[in-house]
Amino acid sequence: MTAPWAALALLWGSLCAGSGRGEAETRECIYYNANWELERTNQSGLERCEGEQDKRLHCYASWRNSSGTIELVKKGCWLDDFNCYDRQECVATEENPQVYFCCCEGNFCNERFTHLPEPGGPEVTYEPPPTAPTLLTVLAYSLLPIGGLSLIVLLAFWMYRHRKPPYGHVDIHEDPGPPPPSPLVGLKPLQLLEIKARGRFGCVWKAQLMNDFVAVKIFPLQDKQSWQSEREIFSTPGMKHENLLQFIAAEKRGCSNLEVELWLITAFHDKGSLTDYLKGNIITWNELCHVAETMSRGLSYLHEDVPWCRGEGHKPSIAHRDFKSKNVLLKSDLTAVLADFGLAVRFEPGKPPGDTHGQVGTRRYMAPEVLEGAINFQRDAFLRIDMYAMGLVLWELVSRCKAADGPVDEYMLPFEEEIGQHPSLEELQEVVVHKKMRPTIKDHWLKHPGLAQLCVTIEECWDHDAEARLSAGCVEERVSLIRRSVNSSTSDCLVSLVTSVTNVDLLPKESSI
């Protein structure tokens, strides 16, 4: 069947050569999907690739080699990748990967795929077995001159009318917005393994992408706005930072409006959220400081306006608007990573900040001005709302620290002791706004020099007066200073610090927002 497809490709190219100048490149590739039933796609056939102006298109193949048995995984189109430039054959070069992958340039170049082992080894080529001539083949050769031309004309007319979006197996009749700055993950083998969390906008899966574990946040179609918002935040220049969740891709999965799922693929962190970790673990003084310092560093960077960020362009100031311990993830060394930017808002000079509804976020972590509905819709006001929530998360850390000479209680959420696990908006307004209550700071915490100073910082974060709250950058510097002063002290110095904690020089409140 190779000859008919080649002839058809030549006819199509000759008809379109005149009209294709200045337009995006097109490519035709062999298509195959081993998971076609699960992903609700065709199992095999041809895929027509359509790219953007000045972008090159390739074909690819991926497969497994289990004890000499070749298991084809996927074939199809691949977007502009310099590793594929000018490759006429599909050749995988990695040594013994779990999944082999190759890409090439040229129509149907992924029909044959090859693994070229380390130098000196034999080249192993995998090629579809030849098939005996069939009646269908004979008919194809006989009818090709007339039928092929008719088919090309019909295809050209149909494509002109429908304008299929590039790489799209899904059409949900919307403007998809700017594409995310990442390769198309949908063409790589991705397997969902287990659900790790469920939230307001869907569920989070642990998944395997090639040889790595990733997190896949799946939104139902009705929560499209949250998916789009988070994708746009991740696509903002300068969002690559050690203390911000690493973004990999955003995709639409499914084949009809009723079955579409919206996927957000990010790095996976096995320790989970800070909430989950504190529930099961008591932390040391150094662990508390490390989490607090890296968490405040991440929020400080998010809040910062960077005119020219590492050559990527202008990074605007961003308010999180749903800062809480559940949205702080932990790396293996307990470095904090901020996540869940579905409610975040950007503040770009000369542009409105977008959707800035007042009462958004998690009720328990809402600042007094949010509970009152008395928000000043300016950048600094939103950053101060984040800082109130930061104070509550720091309190959660202190409540599970064993540094103080006293009992460590079971983990509790902020205000859980005062108004339970499911407080109403009215209860929070009464406690936080009218009574101006805050989570209890235990007496024995104040007997530890470091915790005592940290409690002062916490109180300045959740101050009822929003303008008096510290900035995230100031909190980062405070925690670093406290950590160094305590860790460098001798036992005798610790005794004197306990009696003179109020005289310790903290960073001045001029560092507040």
From Swiss-Prot:
<dbReference type="GO" id="GO:0009749">
    <property type="term" value="P:response to glucose"/>
</dbReference>
<comment type="subunit">
    <text>Forms an activin receptor complex with activin type II receptors such as ACVR1B. Interacts with VPS39. Interacts with DYNLT1. Interacts with BMP3. Interacts with BMP2.</text>
</comment>
<dbReference type="GO" id="GO:0014823">
    <property type="term" value="P:response to activity"/>
</dbReference>
<dbReference type="GO" id="GO:0035265">
    <property type="term" value="P:organ growth"/>
</dbReference>
<dbReference type="GO" id="GO:0005886">
    <property type="term" value="C:plasma membrane"/>
</dbReference>
<dbReference type="GO" id="GO:0031016">
    <property type="term" value="P:pancreas development"/>
</dbReference>
<dbReference type="GO" id="GO:0030501">
    <property type="term" value="P:positive regulation of bone mineralization"/>
</dbReference>
<dbReference type="GO" id="GO:0007368">
    <property type="term" value="P:determination of left/right symmetry"/>
</dbReference>
<keyword id="KW-0479">Metal-binding</keyword>
<dbReference type="Pfam" id="PF00069">
    <property type="entry name" value="Pkinase"/>
</dbReference>
<dbReference type="GO" id="GO:0030279">
    <property type="term" value="P:negative regulation of ossification"/>
</dbReference>
<comment type="function">
    <text>Transmembrane serine/threonine kinase activin type-2 receptor forming an activin receptor complex with activin type-1 serine/threonine kinase receptors (ACVR1, ACVR1B or ACVR1c). Transduces the activin signal from the cell surface to the cytoplasm and is thus regulating many physiological and pathological processes including neuronal differentiation and neuronal survival, hair follicle development and cycling, FSH production by the pituitary gland, wound healing, extracellular matrix production, immunosuppression and carcinogenesis.</text>
</comment>
<dbReference type="GO" id="GO:0060021">
    <property type="term" value="P:roof of mouth development"/>
</dbReference>
<dbReference type="GO" id="GO:0071363">
    <property type="term" value="P:cellular response to growth factor stimulus"/>
</dbReference>
<dbReference type="GO" id="GO:0048185">
    <property type="term" value="F:activin binding"/>
</dbReference>
<protein>
    <recommendedName>
        <fullName>Activin receptor type-2B</fullName>
        <ecNumber>2.7.11.30</ecNumber>
    </recommendedName>
</protein>
<dbReference type="GO" id="GO:0060840">
    <property type="term" value="P:artery development"/>
</dbReference>
<keyword id="KW-0460">Magnesium</keyword>
<dbReference type="GO" id="GO:0007165">
    <property type="term" value="P:signal transduction"/>
</dbReference>
<dbReference type="GO" id="GO:0007498">
    <property type="term" value="P:mesoderm development"/>
</dbReference>
<dbReference type="InterPro" id="IPR011009">
    <property type="entry name" value="Kinase-like_dom_sf"/>
</dbReference>
<feature type="signal peptide">
    <location>
        <begin position="1"/>
        <end position="18"/>
    </location>
</feature>
<dbReference type="GO" id="GO:0032991">
    <property type="term" value="C:protein-containing complex"/>
</dbReference>
<feature type="disulfide bond">
    <location>
        <begin position="29"/>
        <end position="59"/>
    </location>
</feature>
<keyword id="KW-0808">Transferase</keyword>
<dbReference type="GO" id="GO:0016362">
    <property type="term" value="F:activin receptor activity, type II"/>
</dbReference>
<dbReference type="GO" id="GO:0004674">
    <property type="term" value="F:protein serine/threonine kinase activity"/>
</dbReference>
<keyword id="KW-0723">Serine/threonine-protein kinase</keyword>
<keyword id="KW-0325">Glycoprotein</keyword>
<dbReference type="GO" id="GO:0048617">
    <property type="term" value="P:embryonic foregut morphogenesis"/>
</dbReference>
<dbReference type="InterPro" id="IPR000472">
    <property type="entry name" value="Activin_recp"/>
</dbReference>
<dbReference type="GO" id="GO:0001974">
    <property type="term" value="P:blood vessel remodeling"/>
</dbReference>
<keyword id="KW-0472">Membrane</keyword>
<dbReference type="GO" id="GO:0001702">
    <property type="term" value="P:gastrulation with mouth forming second"/>
</dbReference>
<keyword id="KW-0812">Transmembrane</keyword>
<keyword id="KW-0597">Phosphoprotein</keyword>
<dbReference type="GO" id="GO:0042475">
    <property type="term" value="P:odontogenesis of dentin-containing tooth"/>
</dbReference>
<dbReference type="GO" id="GO:0030324">
    <property type="term" value="P:lung development"/>
</dbReference>
<dbReference type="GO" id="GO:0006879">
    <property type="term" value="P:intracellular iron ion homeostasis"/>
</dbReference>
<feature type="transmembrane region" description="Helical">
    <location>
        <begin position="138"/>
        <end position="158"/>
    </location>
</feature>
<dbReference type="GO" id="GO:0006355">
    <property type="term" value="P:regulation of DNA-templated transcription"/>
</dbReference>
<keyword id="KW-1133">Transmembrane helix</keyword>
